[in-house]
From Swiss-Prot:
Protein name: NADH-cytochrome b5 reductase 1
Family the entry assigns: Belongs to the flavoprotein pyridine nucleotide cytochrome reductase family.
Chain ranges passing through the membrane: 8-28
Keywords: FAD, Flavoprotein, Membrane, Mitochondrion, Mitochondrion outer membrane, NAD, Oxidoreductase, Transferase, Transmembrane, Transmembrane helix
Pfam families, alphabetized: FAD_binding_6, NAD_binding_1
Pathway: Protein modification; peptidyl-diphthamide biosynthesis
EC number assigned by the record: 1.6.2.2
PANTHER family per record: NADH-CYTOCHROME B5 REDUCTASE (PTHR19370), NADH-CYTOCHROME B5 REDUCTASE-LIKE (PTHR19370:SF184)
Keyword rRNA processing listed: no
Species of origin: Debaryomyces hansenii (strain ATCC 36239 / CBS 767 / BCRC 21394 / JCM 1990 / NBRC 0083 / IGC 2968) (Yeast)
Length: 284
């Protein structure tokens, strides 16, 4: 007996089903690779994979994501929460990564270890391979290209971290024409964090980014500001108040209080108790 000829329609349908399944699987895997890792309500463990000391009490800590193609999933301008049980108490503190979602497979935190800083000492104690608990994102500021024509920024100490993250996002995008002026205050020259990176940004983008350093205790032949950030320094080195300008602040509370008051004297709207996206003055 002769064998019946295969039904071409069945063959076509089978091949089409196989191809469709393969394509669907490919895009599923692709979406998994690019899916954000962070969960806003659940702490997850991330291993320390690298530690780079940048000053006597400050390090850049690099934490690994589950896959080398993962992104953290943190909008520019927002932060994460680190949680730990310390002396039988649950402690949570917020930090802004200095990396962005352009970096895949890891994220970087710049953390200064304070003598009485529970979480900062907790992170400092970690060895390579050990984990910390993180959740996020959190925060009320999200940067989008072109949201303003210019930013004025004032940072004190580790308050540089959200500024650096926003700066990186702006300057990496050749289509983003936002201009940034940063006043960065510290005690001594050795306390200036990310100085090489900031100076490189200023050299490579002189039309888009300018920085002015202020030190309480400057070395000899110092050409930057001396003492505290004053209204005169703000007026000279930051953009004038306008509807197209935002002022971003991050640093020690006494400094922030003084800067908010000085900003009003320079024509900025009074800062609100809790900053929201769209405020002319935003405090991280």
């Amino acid at each position: 007996m002769s064998q019946p000829e295969p039904n071409p329609f069945i063959i076509f349908a089978t091949v089409a089903a196989i191809i469709s399944s393969a394509v669907a699987y490919y895009f599923f895997q692709l979406s998994r690779k690019n899916a954000p890792v962070l969960k806003p309500n659940d702490f997850q463990k991330f291993p320390l994979i690298e530690k780079t000391r940048v000053s006597h009490n400050t390090c850049v800590y690099r934490f690994g994501l589950p896959r080398s193609t993962d992104r953290l999933g943190l909008p520019i301008g927002q932060h994460i929460a680190i949680g730990a049980t310390i002396n039988d108490k649950e402690v949570v503190r917020s930090y802004t990564p200095i990396s962005t979602d352009d970096e895949l497979g890891y994220f970087d935190l710049l953390i200064k270890a304070y003598e009485n800083g529970n979480i900062s000492r907790h992170v400092e104690s970690k060895k390579i391979g050990e984990t910390i608990d993180i959740r996020g994102p959190k925060g009320f500021f999200t940067y989008t290209p072109g949201m303003v024509e210019s930013f004025g920024m004032i940072a004190g100490g580790t308050g540089i971290t959200p500024m650096y993250q926003i700066l990186t996002a702006i300057l990496r995008n050749p289509e983003d024409k936002t201009k940034v002026s940063l006043v960065y205050a510290n005690v001594t020259e050795d306390d200036i964090l990310l100085k090489e990176e900031l100076n490189k940004m200023a050299r490579e983008h002189p039309d888009r980014f300018k920085i002015y350093y202020v030190l309480n205790t400057p070395p000899e032949n110092w050409t930057g500001g001396v003492g505290f950030v004053t209204p005169e320094i703000m007026d000279k080195h930051l953009p004038k108040a306008s509807e197209a300008t935002n002022l971003l602040l991050c640093g020690p509370p006494p400094m922030i209080s003084a800067m908010k008051k000085a900003a009003v004297g320079l024509g900025y709207q009074k800062a609100k108790p809790v900053s929201k996206l769209g405020d002319q003055i935003f405090v991280f």
